[in-house]
């Protein structure tokens, strides 16, 4: 790095990380499960879910009519139908999505997955396989981001939403940009600044919206809710973790690139996206505690040795 001649070089810094690590070690995970029986675990599960909902800011979330609207229907090659649907997740708060519906193989209801998006993929556009958009095509090739389309090709209905701050749900800071970066990225940072002083969180809003999406699946009534799955990569994995932990209507889930320990992945790596951070969460639980609320439902986790977001211990 080129040395500037307008500053002085600091030989030693007095940062806060060591003190924060010590506080984490002293105060973290006070509500971890300490029982020994299934009955104790079931009681802990219910109490923990209520604690998590409070931490996420769900007491401020408002339910409403879903008011679903089909805005577009496109017939794709290989027989897949792509619907663009918008639902209302809170009063005057809307979630657009693509629904990929493959041809039916039999008379029974089709199996269904929520395919939740992560960062750098323009929300639903990558997950639903919009490779006709050059920037999205590059993200699909780099991250294998089109898992919604891949599910549809395997016979599953894939519901691919824009979570808050992504795609068509970007907030004002990135709405006017016509550049590729604005299109692909999200406004999680801006959402966090709006939400947290009100007692809400980005993770809480995204989890609420995913649960409302399940409401829509049930209300629509066309697909098999007895085997409802959720899958997500990176930030989509975060959403998958939370909604699966809090909503028993999720029957199976796949988390890719998001199951860490908070000390390594979000305290040491403290430059991660604002959507990861929930005030007071670390006092109560680590991420594994949240994941344990999914049991006994099936959970598959993909985690890679070279994923730098795992933290220094890999």
For each predicted feature, which ranges?
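N-terminal targeting or regulatory segments adjacent to alpha/beta-hydrolase or S9 domains
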Residues: 1-81, 89, 94
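Glycine-rich active-site/cofactor-binding loop and its immediate structural neighborhood
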Residues: 74-134
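Cap/lid segment of the alpha/beta-hydrolase catalytic domain
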Residues: 108-109, 114-208, 218-219, 264-268
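Residue in the alpha/beta-hydrolase core beta-strand immediately N-terminal to the catalytic nucleophile
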Residues: 114, 227-229, 252
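Active-site loop->helix "elbow" adjoining a glycine-rich segment at hydrolase catalytic centers
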Residues: 202, 234-237
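Alpha/beta-hydrolase fold nucleophile elbow
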Residues: 222-234
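Short glycine-enriched nucleophile-adjacent loop
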Residues: 237-248
